[in-house]
Amino acid sequence: MASSRTGAGAGGRVVVFPFPFQGHFNPVMRLARALHARGLAITVFHSGALDPADYPADYRFVPVTVEADPKLLASEDIAAIVTTLNASCDAPFRARLSALLAAEGRDSVRCVFTDVSWNAVLTASSDLGVPALGMMTASAASLRDYMAYRTLIDKGYLPVKEERKEDPVPELPPYLVKDLLRVDTSDLEEFAELLARTVTAARRASGLIFNTFPLIETDTLAEIHKALSVPVFAVAPLNKLVPTATASLHGVVQADRGCLQWLDTQQPGSVLYVSFGSMAAMDPHEFVELAWGLADSKRPFVWVVRPNLIRGFESGALPDGVEDEVRGRGIVVAWAPQEEVLAHPAVGGFLTHNGWNSTVEAISEGVPMVCCPRHGDQFGNMRYVCDVWKVGTELVGEQLERGQVKAAIDRLFGTKEGEEIKERMKEFKIAAAKGIGIGVDVDETASPRTDLTDLVDLIKSF
């Protein structure tokens, strides 16, 4: 008699539901490819536009209607956006998953794999009796921050006060108060409630997956495992694990691959790559200061100026005088194939907002960072990069200023400190690769044991 898993792949079927923000979407869909390559069939529940042609032919796709006010989605109120999306998603997701289980049987689905930002999805899956795996697309330290957030408010660390910005936070080393997770464009209480719901949902999960390296967050991962009593898995660097995954949400600006040809003409390690990711924004005067800082550094650069980078403007023409100053030395693109840029031998530094995906990609390619965090977890990421791992320099100041931009670039490219940073980053690159079994010496009859191996075993045990 045929098994109820017939047609579901040798290892069973996983329902994957990515969160519809680019920085969240890509890691989840990339890990889904890794699971698929290891014998698991994939059904993608999705709330945003994606093209099935970008994925393996045997993927299934199930739309889930999620609605929100376009004005809200265009805002920077992250807490309200995520809260609204979860509220809208709950009933449609339950209906879709229930229909799938009714049509194919409970045993047809091993588990639901989703983003912890979909706290409603984690909760609904558990309620329906399906094991749920949550992926943290930020650092493990960020989930530790979620868990401590109410305490931080009760002890007066938050909201951040000017006179306390430089104070250490003993509850969350190595942070200073100014490094604490926050979204200044959202209400603090609403943000705290969102994080509390996320932690509650994570506690009910059958496992938590982190796009991080055991090398850099071993203690934090152990702390989370102990506090939540949930298995934890560190699967970074996903860009090395599944290097060919290129699909993304529709609406993201097409990458300009011409910058790779320009990089081919530059000296090894000479170019600064500048990007603030898919969501971070800056005021017009900061854009001007950054432009002049890059010009004054005399450093070759590739700068990503996406359409919504500058608040109030749809495009970002270089300020008067800058274009002439940097002609032949720097190029500006609307979007870049970041992983390929960071892997290019001409790139010797990355001026970044320290979004977690960008931080992980920089480490995996051994590219030192100039850190310029903008919101959320990026401040804490910067503290680890600069003060704990010592693989980057901090761009000092709350507002971008051309002199500080130039100084931070000069520290990375023209000092003994910069050379030491580059040497440490080479070590991190090697260690990151070994974390997923690349460059590991093993017996010829064995495969290197990794957290991904353990994760697949867990899924197949459900």
Swiss-Prot record:
What protein family is recorded? Answer: Belongs to the UDP-glycosyltransferase family.
Q: What is this protein called?
A: DIMBOA UDP-glucosyltransferase BX9
Which cofactors does this protein require?
Mg(2+); Ca(2+)
What's the source species for this entry?
Answer: Zea mays
Q: CDD domains, per this entry?
A: GT1_Gtf-like
- Reactions catalysed: DIMBOA + UDP-alpha-D-glucose = DIMBOA beta-D-glucoside + UDP + H(+); DIBOA + UDP-alpha-D-glucose = DIBOA beta-D-glucoside + UDP + H(+)
Q: Does the keyword Membrane apply?
A: no
Give the temperature dependence.
Optimum temperature is 45 degrees Celsius.
